[in-house]
Amino acid sequence: YINTGAFPYATRFVDNSLAHSQYLEGIYNTVLVKDVMMRENLKDITLVKSLASFLASNVGSPVSAKKIADTLTSNGRPTGSATVDTYLEALTDAYLFYKVNRYDIKGKMHLKSESKYYICDTGLRNMILGTTNKDIGHQIENIVYLELLRRGYTINIGKSGRGTEVDFVAIRDKKTEYYQVSASVLDESTLERELTPLKQIKDSYPKFLIT
């Protein structure tokens, strides 16, 4: 699942990596052209692909339109943050990516700082990046996000203390749950780093570490 994703028909090609990649590429290109470019009346397919590649590479990492625009500009493609905002909205409207905002757990308010993005399918991410071994930790984090979304939770990134955050604050039926996700916590310092944000939360809602 981490490598191939969850499109039902794609399971026919688990033993044929080329056919699997071609199938996912067909879905990807159809979404970009019909659901992103045509529906939103956008003109720059190269920019859309650049943004999709950037978001796929930075799944689970804080990003902003300005940060992306600066990166594109430094790579020789001058782009304004307003343009990036428009194209990012188109990618999320097409449900190719999901935007997750940050939430101050103590202050109980949404923050206007950098958001995180998660892709709709891990197989698509691997196809876009051309690899199946790109940052397993964020792959697992992406999978947990999609499962929480499937179960009907409203999801935010939680600020739990000074310089610390919880991967997911999941709310459903007026009940809150907190989730930390890590590829491995065998190292004691990693375990402590993952548990610290949960320990800083003073309420009695359930808190989970998934690894």
Where are these regions (language model features)?
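Conserved P-loop NTPase motor "coupling/switch" region that bridges the ATPase
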Residues: 1-7
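Short beta-strand segments
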Residues: 98, 157-158, 180, 209-211
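Structural motif
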Residues: 175-177, 206
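Serine/threonine-rich low-complexity intrinsically disordered regions
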Residues: 3, 15-16, 187
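Short conserved micro-motifs at the rims of enzyme active sites and ligand-binding pockets
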Residues: 129-131, 180, 190-191
